[in-house]
Amino acid sequence: MDWLLATPQLQSVFSSLGSLVGGTYVVSPNALAILEEINHKLTYEDQTLRTFRRAIGFGQNVRVDLIPLLENAKDDAVLESVIRILVNLTVPVECLFSVDLMYRTEVGRHTIFELNKLLYNSKEAFTDPKSTKSVVEYMKHILESDPKLSPHKCDQINNCLLLLRNILHIPETHAHFLMPRLQPGSGHQVSMQNTILWNLFIQSIDKLLLYLMTCPQRSLWGVTMVQLIALIYKDQHVSTLQKLLNLWFEASLSESSDDNESNTTPPKQASGDSSPMLTSDPTSDSSDNGSGGKKESCEERRQALREGTDATLHEVSRKGHEYQNAMASSNAANYILEGPCSAQQPWSDCEMQEYKQMTAVISEPLNLSQPADNVNYTTNANYARTTSTDILTKTTSLKHEGFKPPAPRRNTLSAILSDNYAPLSFISAVKLGQKSPHAGQLQLIKGKCCPQKRECPSSQSEHSDCGYGTQMENPESISTSSNDDDGPQGKPQHQKPPCSSKHRSKQRIFAVPQDTKDLRRKKLVKRSKSSLINMKGLVLHTPNDDDISNLLKEFTVDFLLKGYNYLVEELHSQLLSNAKMPIDTSHFFWLVTFFLKFAAQLELDMEHIDTILTFDVLSFLTYEGVSLCEQLELNARQEGADLRPYLRRMHLVVTAIREFLQAIEAYNKVTHLSEDDRYRLRQLQLQISATTDLRCLFVLLLRRFNPSIHSKQYLQDLVVTNHILLLILDNAAKLEGGQTIGLSEHISQFATLEVMHYYGILLEDFSNNGEYVNDCIFTMMHHIGGDLDQVGVLYQPIILKAYSRIWEADYDICDDWSDLIEYVIHKFLNTPPKSPMAIPTASLTELTKEQNQEHTACPWSQEDMDSLCWYFVQSKRQNDVIGNIAKLFSNNGNKIKTRISIIQQLLQQDIITLLEYDDLMKFEDAEYQRTLLATPTSLTTDSGIELKESAYGKPSDDVQVLLDLIRKENKSQHLVWLQKLLLECCYVKMMIKCGSCQTDVEPIMEPVVYHCMFKQKPIPVVQWNNEQSSTMLYQPFMLLLHKLGIQLPADAGLIFARIPDFWTPETMYGLAKKLGPLDKLTLKFDPRDLEDAPPSRHHTGARNSLSSISSLEADFGDSEGLALIPEVDPAVEKAAAAASAIPNNEIFALPRVKHCNSIIRYTPDPTPPVPSWLQLVMRTKCSKRRSPATDASDCTSTSTMIADDEIKSYASMAQASHTKLNSGYPTSTLVCMNKLSNCSFAAPPNENSSSSGCGGTASSMSMPNMPDGNSDALMKTSFERLAVTGARYLRPSNTDQDYSALVASVYENEFANSDNVSVASDLTRMYVSDEDEKHELQLQQVE
């Protein structure tokens, strides 16, 4: 507690800021310097104990010193400094340090308690209206001072918004506090949050926010604005706001019938209106927005909104001062502001009688001097105190009407909303039977709501629609789903499904009688022209939850009409562009989820949501869904990780997509849309139907559903959203230009035991689900059990039990679902049970039955598998490696391991390559050798692909062997899946290079690939369904991915494999062609654009982790200009590599070992196979010292000398790298590989030359246009390589002993780095390939 010793000095510093003189607070002349000192100490305080701010809290300096200074300071610099200090003091505790760590100690818990107390006292201090008034007025002053805001002034506005955000974010520890100042002796409890919100809205924070959303500098505070709006709606349920809107419309209908008789005079036009009230045709269905038949553009409306807001900012400031003066003279009973009513019609008799009864009602004429559709509203009020509480009782039964004559009917909602529209601050809640919250003199400008009630498809819990930031104790309640009052909570009514053969679920009906629609639209017009709104004028009125809900109901309408589309657009653009400054995406998801349902309910014109209902937004939501699914699963694997943020974001993504799709359905039924709007909706649906990632996303999310961490509400939202998407896909196929979608094939991905089990979990609670949710479940089960004839996946206890309960309870469901239940139960009872199958442990390559049986007979325990690698290292020096490993197992008391099972286990643990496996197996198993002999070796494989006469065109190529093996095992569909992904990456890369926008491109770009390419991130190979997931467990396919240069999940420590983002379109197109023919695939681009492109001079294909160059050679195209590069002296190359090893530590861009997670394997980045400039120079010098080979004997002697020199240098380098460079790299072989990798280019093989490419004729040796002739020697890996010469197989006599010693030393070095064993073993195989090719070369030359 040493920091308390500084408290007297601290109190002296704060007391020097100012003092009260005769009841007036006088600011000290040195206040600015003192504030700067305080801010400096706050910035550099103890980062753990936070002693300085704790001392401030202990001394109550926020309430005693800073708030009075904020309220009375006139100097802008002082105000700026005070606000900056208050922002710093109100930062949440969790942003200061790790709360979990601090809770573990007594000192930490005490620190947290004191900081929370400081925050609570700060929030309590801001319940004074003067404190928030000072902040709001300061922002208005900045905006009025200069239309062109400087960056410094923008920072000042952002600090004000941050302060309001921090204050509203502070939790109320005691939930409520007493306000004896407002209610003496009553003891009525009032929420601090409600009080602050009430004060802010009276001080016209709503108008200010709407202006800031549309000003040119909105990008500087867009994120803060979203956070502030989210906190304003905290703990507000969507269902509550929807009910208020619907109740208001229902109450308005009862008032319209009386007006229809006598209201015949058309309303007068406001001075700022630019269009008449009536269209040329009252029943016109056009979308004219009242601008002389010309639809304003987005920028025009935005500019007009800013101009209209600027015109009223001075008025807002003036009214604010009037409000503050009225607070000082609160002894007056009430104030009535008189003024001309030129834009108003006379009141009705009923209204006049009601007005006479309301002695505390204040009204003010509407300021209509602004352009139509550009008027904002204010809520500047002069408080008035009444002496009679009876007024409250009387005003609760009053009804309000704006003016007597209704406007003639217009069918275009856009014209209704644009004609002299200005958002509401607050509509009298008395007609809803609630207390009107406002007190005092108000300037209120009208707003509109759409009369039609929107039916929501799901019936869910009341806690499902909390505003952003609500924390519920029950995890099942944490959701943002739709309403709980739009579906039956008890027994659903009997309802027949539609007759559609594909989707027979209940269709939502929006049918409203036409006369009811007309009455509602008349009421909207009447409200749009209304200028007098009667409000209860009690300064002592304390707001409750209902008052705040009514207040936010009106702000919701204003926000949707004036700022929603701008704010979403701004946040979306920042999420795509601000890669360096991460933004919490949950704000964006919440904006779409929370407000889009209101836009559909009000049937707002499309121009108000033109930036939300776009394919760009839906594409981003799809990409985020995949990304969050991977992040959630990764964090779920980490013990003790906090999954709540990921669960929250994941749920918000699903609900945002649901609201997006529901809005499309709702607007498809709106009758007053223009042709342009309908065309945009059709195009959006066609884009959705063409997007594979979106529909596959729900297959992925349902498969990855985890009942232990996910809530049932999340599962329900998944099922409902997927159902809505299927309906849209079905309808999109019927549109003009729609593509035929294989829905049956898509639905078959859901026909798994796993997914149907989750449907059964949701069906268990059928009595509480609601009719629509049950329809979604039964529809999917009907398709799977009926159309797909896979009723077997429904034979699960949880599903059958639910069926039995529904059947026994005589639950009233439609006939089709009853038939489904009866069919499944009958089929299950009459299906004979099958004997349990013994699932064999198949070998990785599934080649012969004998191998499988032998492998099954030799089970491997975890201890055996762990010992295998060590035994392999020990036995590497032996001639019979496999026999020695079997002997070691037998000597250590283990069961006898067969030789074949040891070889298979070596391959399974990635200790040997597939080609090494082939070499070992063909000497162990005669049948396996016969299978290899049957492999086609001609220039045309069994797949019909013509292979070029090059290194990678030979069947012995690693990639070609894997491709042949995958095709032989009837797994070609996996290659097609990879081909499609590579072609999509190629297409997106080409479009991004052309600068095309995602919306403008036809055909569309898949969301996941597009956003990864746009953000320059590797593209994930997402396994959408079970079949693709099993593919990633298939060892040959995984080896193929690695050979192609695709980063495996284990290499990156992620769930999905990754395609490098730096690959060029030519590279990706070449890989796709290598995997198989492209004739049957639909290409989105013209392949001639890539084939005619200039060849790349650098290699961007496969990585050097499994082979020195890998099977993907750099395609140099016209390589006649490249001369042959002779071999370099290994000693010289070794010295050059050693000299550059230290400064080039980051050559592989790998993190150091101490920063690596033990579960992550790392693979070095691809490096070009072309020698570096130093290698070129050294090899050129060597070529001058050596005479060129003139005949076969010279070539043989030269190659033999080079091979012997390299073998000796390799052995010495392996030891040097282990002792000197092991600490700098994850494995010593990485450095060793950097030194050893050299490329020798020779002529290609021909009729007169051997397969090695060295002993060719003079003509073949003089051909420089085939640089890949000897590169195949760098890829082939084997212990004892068979050289293919025609159809005859030759076996080398023996293996060099020096080489064996080298391999053993390398394995010993790798075993010391256990986390990277697989990478080290892969690199060692490159040396095997390199050395064996040189021995093969010598052998063939001798023969």
Swiss-Prot record:
A motif (Nuclear localization signal) lies at residues 517-527. Residues 471-482 have a biased composition (Polar residues). Residues 293-314 have a biased composition (Basic and acidic residues). Its main location: nucleus. Residues 256-314, 453-512, 1247-1270 are annotated as: Disordered. One of its GO terms (cellular component) is perinuclear region of cytoplasm. GO terms for molecular function: DNA binding. It comes from the Eukaryota. Keywords: Biological rhythms, Cytoplasm, Nucleus, Phosphoprotein, Repeat. The keyword Phosphoprotein applies. InterPro entries: Timeless, TIMELESS_C, Timeless_N. Signal peptide: none annotated. The keyword Cytoplasm applies. Residues 273-288, 489-498, 1249-1262 have a biased composition (Low complexity). Phosphorylated with a circadian rhythmicity. GO terms for biological process: DNA repair; DNA replication checkpoint signaling; entrainment of circadian clock; replication fork arrest; rhythmic process. Residues 238-270 are annotated as: Necessary for normal circadian rhythm. It is found in: Nucleus; Cytoplasm, Perinuclear region. PANTHER family: PROTEIN TIMELESS (PTHR22940:SF5), TIMEOUT/TIMELESS-2 (PTHR22940). Belongs to the timeless family. Forms a heterodimer with period (PER); the complex then translocates into the nucleus. Required for the production of circadian rhythms. The biological cycle depends on the rhythmic formation and nuclear localization of the TIM-PER complex. Light induces the degradation of TIM, which promotes elimination of PER. Nuclear activity of the heterodimer coordinatively regulates PER and TIM transcription through a negative feedback loop. Behaves as a negative element in circadian transcriptional loop. Does not appear to bind DNA, suggesting indirect transcriptional inhibition. This is Protein timeless. The lineage of its organism: Eukaryota, Metazoa, Ecdysozoa, Arthropoda, Hexapoda. The gene is tim.
